Amino acid sequence: IEMNKNMKILDGLYGDRDDFGIASFTIDPENDTPTTLKKYSELIEVKSKNWHFLTGDKKDIYDLSNKGFNIFSSINEAVEGGFEHQGFFALIDKDGYIRSRVNDYGTPIVYYSGITNENEDVQGIEMIKEDIDKLLNLK
């Protein structure tokens, strides 16, 4: 849920642009049907036509997460909800490439923390906003 709250911040900043979009992939496709996801988007008051809540075959979703984006997600009956994930955002450019940056030591930062909130370090959200601005030539 924190991820979607933070994604709403990004949607509020960029959601009216034709050159920006958000894809949220469920990792619980057995419960998150297209109808359920539509109701959820209404519940959290998504206004942008460019924010898509996506579901599909469980194996395909987990393969996309783990192998395509290289972002961990897994079924885990021992945790609340029965699944776990890293809570990262990936920034994909218009050509389909995952964008990244380097830290002060030259180490690549490929993903952005999406589970931060106002009571924690918001560095991941601030970094993705900066990088979106660069991609959209806003700064």
For each predicted feature, which ranges?
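Solvent-exposed, non-transmembrane alpha-helical starts
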Residues: I1-E2, G81
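Structural microenvironment flanking redox-active thiols in thiol-disulfide oxidoreductases
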Residues: E2-L64
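Alpha-helix boundary/interfacial micro-motifs
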Residues: D11, L43-E45, S74, Y105, ...
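Sec/Tat-exported extracytoplasmic proteins
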Residues: D11-G15, I44, S65-S73, I132-K139
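Generic preference for well-ordered secondary structure
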Residues: G21-S24, E45-K49, N76, E80, ...
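Short, charged low-complexity intrinsically disordered segments located at boundaries
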Residues: T35-K38, K67-S74, L91-I98
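Structural micro-motif
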Residues: K49-W51, Y62, F69-S74, F83-A90
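Thiol-/selenol-based redox modules, centered on thioredoxin-like
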Residues: E77-K139
